């Protein structure tokens, strides 16, 4: 993740933003600012997860679609 922000730190910050928004004590402007920040953090986290998934698939030589197909065949 960019600027040295780690995935776990981003998740923690995102959880705090959700708590603040759920309380409903922020002004409209503060809520919008926090919402925007939360969306940005969520996108970064999703990108990090996608990259990790791709790396795992590359390292293991598997594709999630192939695994699903083989699971379906064995359960029939």
Curated annotation (Swiss-Prot):
Coiled coil: none annotated. Its EC number is 3.1.11.6. GO terms for molecular function: exodeoxyribonuclease VII activity. Signal peptide: none annotated. The keyword Nuclease applies. GO terms for cellular component: cytosol; exodeoxyribonuclease VII complex. It is found in: Cytoplasm. It catalyses: Exonucleolytic cleavage in either 5'- to 3'- or 3'- to 5'-direction to yield nucleoside 5'-phosphates. Keywords: Cytoplasm, Exonuclease, Hydrolase, Nuclease. GO terms for biological process: DNA catabolic process. Pfam families: Exonuc_VII_S. It comes from the Bacteria. HAMAP family: Exonuc_7_S (MF_00337). Belongs to the XseB family. Bidirectionally degrades single-stranded DNA into large acid-insoluble oligonucleotides, which are then degraded further into small acid-soluble oligonucleotides. Heterooligomer composed of large and small subunits. This is Exodeoxyribonuclease 7 small subunit. It comes from Legionella pneumophila (strain Corby). The gene is xseB.
